[in-house]
């Protein structure tokens, strides 16, 4: 007799939610639709998550854990300022591209009409990433003896706005316009401009 692996129902619910966000762009996901997709009753959903907001929080926790842990690895492994910035931006874009449904959460599109604390959490995540970029840029002076002519906070904001814009285009195009398209060429241009400042 074959033993089937035990399904982690909580993870399965989150995977179905992410899949529905991808396959139903621009549409609101109801708990009734999600329960049908998962193959359980709405009551069964609520045994694992007390509310739909908690389901979205589960996705946001996955996003935070995935991105912030990888950014820490970049910080440990790479010492060059420009390479660090490139890798952080590339991480954001590749993560969004590989997780189209979740990119709607990053973009805020899937959170319209949902609990305000969800949008606040995504805003806080982007604030942490911007702070990390600012720190990377500030360390250039310490590591290389030369900083930038423009304030690092302004530059960090510009870099993050670039990544957020690419993610917004991806969501708006219903996942046709990949965030990483032309990234290498765009990064070379951005890097050249940063080094000139």
Swiss-Prot record:
Required for nucleoid occlusion (NO) phenomenon, which prevents Z-ring formation and cell division over the nucleoid. Acts as a DNA-associated cell division inhibitor that binds simultaneously chromosomal DNA and FtsZ, and disrupts the assembly of FtsZ polymers. SlmA-DNA-binding sequences (SBS) are dispersed on non-Ter regions of the chromosome, preventing FtsZ polymerization at these regions. GO terms for molecular function: sequence-specific DNA binding. GO terms for cellular component: bacterial nucleoid; cytoplasm. This is Nucleoid occlusion factor SlmA. Keywords: Cell cycle, Cell division, Coiled coil, Cytoplasm, DNA-binding. The keyword Ion transport does not apply. Residues 109-136 form a coiled coil. It comes from Shewanella baltica (strain OS155 / ATCC BAA-1091). NCBIfam families: PRK09480.1 (NF007015). Residues 7-67 form the HTH tetR-type domain. Belongs to the nucleoid occlusion factor SlmA family. SUPFAM superfamilies: Homeodomain-like (SSF46689). PROSITE patterns: HTH_TETR_2. Residues 30-49 bind DNA. One of its GO terms (biological process) is negative regulation of division septum assembly. Homodimer. Interacts with FtsZ. It is found in: Cytoplasm, Nucleoid.
